[in-house]
């Protein structure tokens, strides 16, 4: 029965690990911050520099790769104790991204409510962010 209860968490953990690994690798190859791109450019604009954007992009990509790596390692070797701390840090990073992109960035530029298409696009992006945040929290609770 314990294995059957763990199955949904395992599937979600593998999916999340692959998503984060692929996102981090893609972001390094394409030199953008992927799902965090809007937040990186928002923060880069505050610091007024392309160097800040490059450093933030690299940091975000490495965070995605690190979180995905730890999730995959934890799936294969569940006795690893630092995974919960890494996931907690990534939950905070993801929530901060959501605030910066889905709230401050979107409504600050005033483009969300321009038309139905932009509102639906924003709603879709926010829903994806919430799904990933929920998956991170769920997997973190089940890796303890």
Swiss-Prot record:
Subcellular location per the Swiss-Prot or TrEMBL entry: Cell membrane
GO annotation, cellular component aspect: plasma membrane
Coiled-coil residue spans: none
Positions of transmembrane segments: 7-29, 51-73, 85-107, 122-139
Membrane-topology descriptor: Multi-pass membrane protein
Keyword tags: Cell membrane, Membrane, Transmembrane, Transmembrane helix
Disulfide bridge partners, by residue number: none
Protein name listed in UniProt: Uncharacterized protein TP_0638
Organism annotation: Treponema pallidum (strain Nichols)
């Amino acid at each position: 029965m314990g294995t059957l209860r763990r199955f949904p968490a395992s599937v979600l953990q593998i999916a999340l690990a692959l998503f984060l690994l692929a996102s981090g690798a893609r972001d390094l190859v394409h030199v953008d911050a992927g799902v965090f791109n809007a937040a990186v450019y928002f923060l880069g604009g505050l610091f007024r520099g392309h160097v800040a954007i490059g450093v933030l992009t690299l940091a975000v990509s490495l965070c995605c790769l690190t979180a995905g790596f730890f999730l995959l390692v934890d799936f294969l070797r569940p006795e690893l104790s630092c995974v919960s701390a890494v996931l907690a840090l990534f939950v905070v990073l993801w929530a901060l991204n959501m605030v910066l992109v889905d709230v401050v960035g979107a409504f600050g530029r005033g483009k969300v409510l321009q038309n139905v298409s932009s509102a639906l696009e924003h709603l879709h992006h926010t829903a994806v962010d919430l799904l990933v945040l929920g998956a991170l929290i769920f997997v973190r609770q089940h890796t303890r």
